[in-house]
Amino acid sequence: MNRLPSSASALACSAHALNLIEKRTLDHEEMKALNREVIEYFKEHVNPGFLEYRKSVTAGGDYGAVEWQAGSLNTLVDTQGQEFIDCLGGFGIFNVGHRNPVVVSAVQNQLAKQPLHSQELLDPLRAMLAKTLAALTPGKLKYSFFCNSGTESVEAALKLAKAYQSPRGKFTFIATSGAFHGKSLGALSATAKSTFRKPFMPLLPGFRHVPFGNIEAMRTALNECKKTGDDVAAVILEPIQGEGGVILPPPGYLTAVRKLCDEFGALMILDEVQTGMGRTGKMFACEHENVQPDILCLAKALGGGVMPIGATIATEEVFSVLFDNPFLHTTTFGGNPLACAAALATINVLLEQNLPAQAEQKGDMLLDGFRQLAREYPDLVQEARGKGMLMAIEFVDNEIGYNFASEMFRQRVLVAGTLNNAKTIRIEPPLTLTIEQCELVIKAARKALAAMRVSVEEA
C-alpha cells in the first residue's frame, strides 16, 4: 500500500532536527533517544546496510557510536561524551583539523554576505580560488573547474581529456589495478574494485587496467594500444593508492609514467583527492618527484573539513577546449561562495602553519612507532607503510584488522579499513595532530595488539 505524504510529519521531524542543531549538550535521556532515532532512521530511510558496517566497534557489539560534535582540532565526541582521537580524518578531509577556526570564520563571514552565487554575475571567490590554485599547483596548471566531490573532479578530468584528445583520434584510458577514483559511472570505469563495478556493468568502454607501480606493464599497454589503433587519451592514477591500501609505487614511478605519456602523446591525470593538500608531506604528492601532470584532481581536504568542494585543474592547452563553450561541463553548486571561502582559508592555514612539513615530521614519528609494533607482533602485523600522514597497518588476515579497529575504539582512537583492501587499517589523522597525541596513538596501538594477542592465545 502506498504511503500518503504527510506535511505535518515532515514539519515535526524538521523542527525536531533544528532543535537538536541548536543544542550544545544532551542529558542522558536525550542521548538515549537520539541514538534510538538515528539507528531507526538509518534502517528505515537511509540504508540498513550501513548499520552492519558501523556495527561491533563498541564494547557491547552494538551499532557504532552516534557522532555529536568535534571535541578539539583533532578529536571527536559522541553522544555519551566520550572523546576520541581521530585517526580516520573523515577519509582524509580534516587535514587542518575539525572546525578549524580560520576556516569556520571565513565561511561564517561569507554566509553573512551571500551563501550561494546568482549564476549570472561573476563571483569573486571562485576567481580568487582559481588564481590561488594556479599559483599553488606544480608546472603549467592554470585553469580550474570547481565541483563538490572527488568523483566529480575525476568525471571532469575524464571529460576534459576526451574533449582534448577526441579530435586527435585518441579514446582509450589506462588506469591501474587497485585504483579508486570514485563511484559515478565514468570514475567507476577507472576504479578497479570488482565489488563496486560488477553491479553496474557494462561501464564506459575504452578503459584498461595495468598493475600499479609496474612501469613495464604501462609501457606494454601503451604500445599495444598504439599497435591496435586504440591510442591512449590519458593515463589516470593516484600517486599513492589510498583505498587500495596505502600502496606506494617504487621510487621514480611517477617520473617514468610522465615520460611515457609524453612519448605516446597521452595526457597524465593525477588523482590527488586523498594525497593532496599536504597529506603526504608535500602540498601535492607528485611534488616528491617534481612531476607535473596535465590535469590534477583535488577534493576532500580542500574544503577544510567544513564545506564540500572539488577541483579539476588543467594546463591552458588542455582546458582551452572549453573556452568556446564554457557550458559543456558545469554544475550548479560547484565553486559556490561558501565552498570557495572554505578552500581559500584552508590553503591559507596549510601555508601559514607549514602543515605539509608537520605532516612529514609527525608522519615519520607515527610510522616509526607502527613499524616497531610490526616487529614486536609479527604474528599479527604484516607491514606498516605510508608517507607523511597517510599510513596503513596491514594485518595477516581480514579478521585481525577488524579486531584492531574495535580495540582501538576501546582505546578511544578512531581508525578504519580501506575500501579495496580489507586487511589494511588506514591511519589518516589531521595534520594538526600534536606530538603528545601521536604518542598516545602509538601507545593505544600497542595496547590493542597486546589485547588481541591474548585473545588469540586464549582461543
Swiss-Prot record:
Optimum temperature is 60 degrees Celsius. Highly active from 20 to 80 degrees Celsius. HAMAP family: Putres_aminotrans_3. Belongs to the class-III pyridoxal-phosphate-dependent aminotransferase family. Putrescine aminotransferase subfamily. The lineage of its organism: Bacteria, Pseudomonadati, Pseudomonadota, Gammaproteobacteria, Enterobacterales. Pfam families: Aminotran_3. One of its GO terms (biological process) is putrescine catabolic process. Its cofactor is pyridoxal 5'-phosphate. Keywords: Aminotransferase, Pyridoxal phosphate, Transferase. It is an enzyme of class 2 (transferase). Optimum pH is 7.2. Optimum pH is 9.0. Active at alkaline pH. Its EC number is 2.6.1.82, 2.6.1.29. The modification N6-(pyridoxal phosphate)lysine is found at K300. Gene3D superfamilies: Aspartate Aminotransferase, domain 1 (3.90.1150.10), Type I PLP-dependent aspartate aminotransferase-like (Major domain) (3.40.640.10). The gene is patA. Induction: Up-regulated under nitrogen starvation conditions. Expression is sigma-54-dependent. Up-regulated by putrescine; this gene expression regulation is controlled by at least two sigma factors: rpoS under excess nitrogen conditions and rpoN under nitrogen-starvation conditions. Can be used in the industrial production of the value-added compound 5-aminovalerate. One of its GO terms (molecular function) is diamine transaminase activity. Signal peptide: none annotated. It catalyses: an alkane-alpha,omega-diamine + 2-oxoglutarate = an omega-aminoaldehyde + L-glutamate; putrescine + 2-oxoglutarate = 1-pyrroline + L-glutamate + H2O; cadaverine + 2-oxoglutarate = 5-aminopentanal + L-glutamate. This is Putrescine aminotransferase.
